[in-house]
Amino acid sequence: MKEKIRKKILLASEEPGVYIFKNKGVPIYIGKAKRLSSRLRSYLNPQTEKVFRIVEEADELETIVVMNEREAFILEANLIKKYRPKYNVRLKDTNFYPYIRISDDEIPYVEIVKRKLRDGTYFGPYTSVQFVRNLLEILQKIMGFRTCKSDLKRIKRPCFLYHLGRCIGPCIGNIESHEEAIRKLREFLSGNMEEVFDYLKEKMETHSKMLDFENAAKYRDLLLNLSNVLESQGVVFEENINCDVLVHAHDLFVVLRVRNGYLVGKISFEMEGGSVEDFIREYYISGRGDIPKTLILESDLDEMDYSSLGFEYVGPPRSTTEEDLLEKAKKNLENELKMRGLRKEALEELMKLLNMKDFPYRIEGIDISHLQGKYTVASLVVFEDGFPKKSDYRRYKIEQDHPDDYESIRTVVKRRYSKHPLPNLLFVDGGIGQVNAAIEALKEIGKDCPVVGLAKKEETVVFENREIHLPHDHPVLRLLVQIRDETHRFAVSYHRKRREKESLRSVLDNVPGIGPIRKKKLIEHFGSLENIRSASLEEIARVIGSTEIARRVLDIL
């Protein structure tokens, strides 16, 4: 420990605050304390390897005194979020979780996003993208909020969704009605769902009494569909409870999110060496998750006043319902741990089966998709520690005039690994020919990496010019099938998207006045024929700069 740091520790204040260990001006560890002097003195006699490394590496110590522990907690969270010091524990998503965002525009729009920023109101995270899509589709039919991002001041004719009855139409002056729709949506997503259910029941009963059975059936179906979408996420509780339930074991944290009696999500995170307090700071205080009124834990925390942060209660269950929720959270945690054990077992078996030197922590999978040689694309998916890492997925467009999977594989392997590091194992969807094509491509660029394939016919594992037959329930085969299915799904979805864009190009070629520049603008803005069909004349005209040509586009479509 540097002498100047020792002196600062001995002179530290008794007040609450935040301390920052730095190396060459860069924060390497940030902590908080109810009493800075007491906390910092523990660093004079390091008891763990981590603390020893911090004090040995640090050449500077900065302290910031605040009014109370709450301020210290929030400041610590904000500083860690800003600087991401290497010795602070970090929250690692084990999956991608979507959010619902209400924009901060004068007339807001609603969308599904991957990340939470400071540019609107966010709700989530949710467990499933499909669940969020289904939920928003039903809620839009009920409330009529807008989901388009168009500049409403320039629109004179409402879009397709307005004519379908799914949007109120703020673009044609229905501003107050849209404000009410957004208010209802905020209330619903905040957990206050009774208003929407009561509204649907009232409408259904009113139309039924008037013998207007067609509209009564419409509201009945909306009510049933909304209930079904919410129930698809899991258990429905008798009480209108709004809470999160947090449990953890080892480095794994699981949160059950319950809103208005509905289990709306289960999310899991890894945090190496993290405590419950660390998780609350990283997940809630830093803004990744919305703060619920109640946070159920397995036991009491320290005397920290979490109510001042927005929680009304943080602690163990107070009712049988909360006890049941805690038990459900524990079972989910056990299942997550079991799954991780099975994945690790599968990876260890894979390592033995292929006689690999290194543990296959990172596996990258490649698949080719085309239509009789046209619109050829390649997908590259990534699995780390047996789980998909979607943020590292990549797509490649391959130009060729005839179907040749081997050449396509060689092309994408050379493009990928001439610029990027090799994985521990490369997976190719296919048999011996596809595997050898990948190996040849690696040799051409002077690289070497184990390559494994999975032949489609009998789910046969292919490695080093030999076929390995495994039982259908073998953990290695199950893992490789999952990787194969994911590479195929990702490749097919990109191929479909490329094919739609090419179809759009060919249709636009027949529109007088649409040249290469306008065609490019339309494709980049709308992406598909369906999106152009549902757009207004004004929106198309704004993109290409001509109302007359925009009218021709709509006429042809």
From Swiss-Prot:
Q: Major place of localization?
A: cytoplasm
Q: Where in the cell is it found?
A: Cytoplasm
GIY-YIG domain residues: 14-89
Cite the PROSITE patterns for this sequence: GIY_YIG, UVR, UVRC
Which key words tag this protein in UniProt?
Cytoplasm, DNA damage, DNA excision, DNA repair, Excision nuclease, SOS response
Q: Does the keyword DNA repair apply?
A: yes
Q: Which domain of life is it from?
A: Bacteria
Known Gene3D superfamilies for this protein? Answer: 5' to 3' exonuclease, C-terminal subdomain, GIY-YIG endonuclease, UVR domain, UvrC, RNAse H endonuclease domain
| One Pfam family from the record | GIY-YIG
Specify the protein name.
UvrABC system protein C
Q: What is the phylogenetic placement of the source species in the record?
A: Bacteria, Thermotogati, Thermotogota, Thermotogae, Thermotogales
